[in-house]
Amino acid sequence: MSTTFGGERLIEWNVPVWEHSLEGGLRMLRLAIDTHIITSHFALPLLIQNEGGLVVEMTDGTAEYNAENYRLSLFYDLAKTSVIRLAWAQAKELAPHGCAAVALTPGWLRSEMMLDNFGVEEPNWRDALTVQPHFAISETPRYVGRAVADLAADPLVARFNGRSLSSGGLAKEYDFTDLDGSQPDAWRYLVEVQDASRPADATGYR
């Protein structure tokens, strides 16, 4: 699994490319793309020694969502969509060796950084809903971790080779839940509720 990024503090949201820090933007791309390619360059010779190997490229957003939605920064948009294409390209190269590659995205992740941004911790994360009501669809890191575990244990995982997957979608595929027993489907929620300017209500989406 390749999850390297660390470029969050370099993002300048809603700033056009000609005003965005070029140094920061290019650094973001190196963190998002170069690190994944370098990891694959050295790790895949080991992976292909046995059939059934799997590469999971972690990103933000499904291919479907990112194809229709600008991610509010040219550099961030490019960084996250490139990882999806990277998984697709690796899938082509790995298939002859009986191995697979997928791109996987969590939903609205309650990472430590996200919780810090809202001034909450995991036990009281719902307090953040007073600031951002749509945070109701968020999920723990364990949720996408369970998605990875089920993918890795699936003897038929090759059927997903080259695809863009999400924690919410795989929860339905493999019938796992987040820690609270729910199945957040963040990307469907973002399209149908948040982006549609509907009132925040996660009913039917988790």
Describe the role of every protein-language-model region.
Residues 56, 97-102, 163:
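Rossmann-like NAD(H)/NADP(H) cofactor-binding core
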Residues 103, 123-206:
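C-terminal helical subdomain
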